[in-house]
Amino acid sequence: MTQETFTATTRVKRGLADMLKGGVIMDVVTPEQARIAEDAGASAVMALERVPADIRAQGGVARMSDPDLIEGIVNAVSIPVMAKARIGHFVEAQILESLGVDFIDESEVLSPADYVNHIDKWNFDVPFVCGATNLGEALRRITEGAAMIRSKGEAGTGDVSEAVKHLRTIRGEINRLRSMDEDQLYVAAKEIQAPYDLVREVAATGKLPVTLFVAGGVATPADAALVMQMGAEGVFVGSGIFKSGNPAARAAAIVKATTMYDDPAAIAEVSRGLGEAMVGINVADVPAPHRLAERGW
């Protein structure tokens, strides 16, 4: 790959992710749910066999979804479709690319296939989404070719606190870099185990070079507005919609709250009459070995 081709491919992949800014990406497990999400205004859907709450509850090894399920969802909607591959499982990613998905999420929600290496995302034409809990992790995924970063949160809990923590961590570390001189940036790059050129770029621009969404525990319109006000560029919602009492209404309300995140009166209005939110789990009650956000390095 020539430098010109590399630059153009990177620009295209990141541009596709940029088109989703300000939107909501929803987990769906059937074509019918995908159509509900599209009708509610979702900017994209994530096709998978089990939402994170069910993966957490049922345990076992969580793998890439059945190709028939993914193709059924791709054929059901006109908005972009994402699908998950296990960390390090480049063959699952190859399969997903062959199925024509629009984005691949190398996801800690599934059981890792490789505890040393993430997928080399430069080997694919399809853009990748990856999770991160801090700036170093985000920059390592970008170095591997990720076109979008999502702060991980703790998927399948309905507890937004970890999403808030990870977003604050990433943004706080970016702000810290901005106050450093060049010598300090070299040290910071070593500390966070990220390439110096990327660290310097982040320090100069005050943001990641790719789109930053938030995931993990967003369950209400207020949750979505919270992370948007904190600087997220969009929201992933997993179990919070289709594990709630009125999925269609909640999906539409979260989309509206994500768009009107700085209008409390509008958020209050869309929060009315949504029925019961998902019951969820307090992250503090989840033992460390069972926390999905700990997967990845």
Curated annotation (Swiss-Prot):
Pfam families per record: SOR_SNZ
GO MF annotation: an example: pyridoxal 5'-phosphate synthase (glutamine hydrolysing) activity
GO biological process: amino acid metabolic process; pyridoxal phosphate biosynthetic process; pyridoxine biosynthetic process
Enzymatic reactions: aldehydo-D-ribose 5-phosphate + D-glyceraldehyde 3-phosphate + L-glutamine = pyridoxal 5'-phosphate + L-glutamate + phosphate + 3 H2O + H(+)
Pathway: Cofactor biosynthesis; pyridoxal 5'-phosphate biosynthesis
Catalytic center residues: 84
Binding site for D-ribose 5-phosphate: 27, 156, 217, 238-239
EC number: 4.3.3.6
Positions contributing to D-glyceraldehyde 3-phosphate binding: 168
Keyword Calcium: no
Matching InterPro entries: Aldolase_TIM (IPR013785), PdxS/SNZ (IPR001852), PdxS/SNZ_N (IPR033755), RibuloseP-bd_barrel (IPR011060)
EC top class named in words: lyase
Matches recorded under SUPFAM superfamilies: Ribulose-phoshate binding barrel
Keywords: Lyase, Pyridoxal phosphate, Schiff base
Matching PROSITE patterns: PDXS_SNZ_1, PDXS_SNZ_2
Family as reported in the entry's similarity comment: Belongs to the PdxS/SNZ family.
Subunit structure: In the presence of PdxT, forms a dodecamer of heterodimers.
Protein role: Catalyzes the formation of pyridoxal 5'-phosphate from ribose 5-phosphate (RBP), glyceraldehyde 3-phosphate (G3P) and ammonia. The ammonia is provided by the PdxT subunit. Can also use ribulose 5-phosphate and dihydroxyacetone phosphate as substrates, resulting from enzyme-catalyzed isomerization of RBP and G3P, respectively.
Protein name as it appears in the record: Pyridoxal 5'-phosphate synthase subunit PdxS
